Amino acid sequence: MEITFLIGNGFDIGLGMRTQYSQFIPRYIKNGKNKSTVLKDFSEQLGKNIDKWSYFEKQIGEYTLEFSKDNKYDLIDQLEDFEKEFIAYLLEEESKLEFNDSDKIGQFFQETILKFYETLHPESITSIKEVFKTYRASGHNYNFISFNYTQALDKCLEKIPNKKINTRKVSNTIYTDTVGKVVHVHGLCNQFPLIGLNDVEQIKNSELANNPEFVKYLIKPSLNKLHRMGNASNASKMIDTSKIICIYGMSLGETDLLWWNKLVAWLNGGNDRHLIVFEHDDHFSRSSQFGWIRKMDSLIDKLQSYNKNPGIKVESLRDRIHLSLKDIFAYPLLEKERNNQIESFEHKIEKLQDKVDKTTQIYIGKEEPSNAKEGDIWLQVVE
């Protein structure tokens, strides 16, 4: 049996990486001050409307209204410059992760994958267990479709010994459940990363939307075909063969509408297929009878708004759509950064000690030391 996880930026964030567009954009704006006019214009546009650009790819479609057929390739130059800096930023963030504690990392992800459905509501858990019961006499492959450009997910999965999730005995036959394939549907930092829109309709400039030579640079499905890496087709096949699909760390944004539409068609294709959506929400309260139903309604409505499949109503699939508000894969791996900060701080203290009188003591702590004398230095630690 095939179980597939669709993984978004929430995974990298759960490891401690600062990988949201909104966290990168201020740096790009700052760097843009010394660039050519065309590139500087883009950084200034971001600065003026930073709230609108919180969902970057969607805003690209709106931004096309600032261009005409005469300067349309200025937009491509701007996006290329942005992508180059963003990828460098992601690589910098990824380099901060610490993977030395292989055993603990491997054990955490092995156990989390094995128990992925245990944060669901009781009846949902029963439904998922029934699927596993039906396909108990087969090995279970846990596949991953990553929408991230980093390889943080790959590195975590590599820590699982022999990629083995579980071993089961059924009627005297041993079955092994393993980590299957990882497909990066939008490429990697060093392998054709794709930033863009879902379709031509999302290009708000009608003149440019009717220009095929321009459009091919902005539409992700077209970009995937042109690069011939097979990422989209491999991901599509992975979905088709799955019995359970989980969405984790994704906002279900409209620039990936192609995939949400496909999931609706897939779910409708068999009564033994189940979709699980992990929507992290620490502030959700169970003290109201309305909150959970509203969340489910919102999810159903969003999927229906993306649904282009004739004759299919997402509401009719509700019983096989499950929701969890737990952040199951969160596992901070920024120890390297913390150690670097400590080493840097200690180095600064040493330099400070060299500059002051040798009789001067430097104290570090939450409270001022009682034995400090006049002229001593107290560095207060604030948590």
What are these regions (language model features)?
Residues E2-L6, L15, T19, Q23-G187, ...:
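Active-site periphery "cap/insert" segments of enzyme catalytic domains
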Residues N9-F11:
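Phosphate-binding glycine-rich loops of NTP-binding sites
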Residues Y142, G180-V182, I312-V314, R318-I321, ...:
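Short, conserved active-site loop motifs that form the nucleotide-linked donor/cofactor pocket
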Residues V183, L194-N205, Y331-S344:
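Short, surface-exposed amphipathic charged segments that create phosphate/polyanion-binding patches used
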Residues L258-W266, R273-K348:
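C-terminal regions of proteins
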Residues I349-E383:
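Extracellular/surface-exposed low-complexity repeats and stalk/linker segments enriched in Gly/Pro
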